[in-house]
Regions:
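Transmembrane alpha-helices and adjacent helix-loop boundaries
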Residues: 1-251
Length: 251
């Protein structure tokens, strides 16, 4: 079957030279695509997890009794929401990256302790996290004050009320908006190619650069793969949203 597919795309290339699906009949190029796919998955999963954590913590800190803490969180939100994620990525990697400590694995080459993949995760997580803070804040405000007052009457601390009462309800209310933000985050990971992160788009552009006849196939495959990835995420989030829905909240 694999040999049949390989021969099929070789024949297509002979008939239509501008449609060279080289990654289907050249194992080396296929390996590059597979590597890019897994880097994209790893980058996306890491950014989703960290951005949600940032959103949860930031939303809680927004309710702090200390004005300084609230101002710091608000400043963070304004900075990351009002500057392009591409500029943020370059700032983290080139501006802050020069201060990163290095180590020498072989006693000769100096390597920064935070790689380009690490900086991409940090930058994109902070970017998406700023939106998640506002999403979770809106969810928290949707929880009736009487619910919080009841938990406090039971002797719960502010942190316990947030963890066990407010956040579970707020999370359910926030899921639709969170879904949209995470979809945008997955699409934004393609910008990591600017700092040479070998994700999916980077690998396809490299193949196109090495084999100009693979231009149309490369862009077509990127388009199809991202439709699939985003489609799976949207479907999963919608299923999760329905499973966690509570009558009377977020409807």
């Amino acid at each position: 079957m694999i040999e049949f597919i390989r021969q099929l795309f070789l024949d297509l290339y002979e008939v239509a030279p501008r449609w060279n699906f080289i990654f289907f009949h050249d194992k080396t190029q296929w390996d590059r695509v597979a590597e890019g796919f897994w880097v994209t998955i790893e980058l996306s999963v890491a950014c989703v997890i960290f951005s949600v954590i940032i959103g949860v913590v930031g939303a809680w800190l927004q309710g702090s009794h200390l004005r300084l803490v609230r101002n710091i969180v608000q400043g963070y939100i304004q900075f990351f929401r009002n500057t392009p994620p591409f500029v943020q990525l370059l700032f983290f990697y080139f501006a802050l990256g020069q201060f990163t400590p290095t180590y020498s694995p072989d006693g000769w080459l100096e390597v920064p302790i935070i790689s380009n993949v690490g900086w991409a995760i940090i930058s994109l997580s902070f970017f998406a996290g700023a939106f998640n803070v506002e999403i979770f804040r809106a969810g928290i405000e949707a929880v009736p004050d009487s619910t919080q007052e009841a938990s406090e009457a039971l002797g719960m601390s502010r942190l316990q009320t947030y963890i066990y009462v407010v956040f579970p309800l707020a999370f359910r209310v926030s899921l639709p908006a969170l879904n949209n933000n995470l979809v945008n985050l997955i699409k934004t990971t393609t910008q990591a190619l600017a700092i040479a992160v070998p994700e999916l788009l980077y690998q396809f552009l490299s193949i196109w650069n090495d084999y100009p006849s693979a231009l149309y196939p490369s862009l077509t495959m990127v388009f199809i793969i991202y439709i699939g990835l985003v489609g799976i995420l949207v479907y999963s989030m919608h299923r999760w949203e329905k499973a966690m829905r509570i009558p009377g909240y977020g409807q």
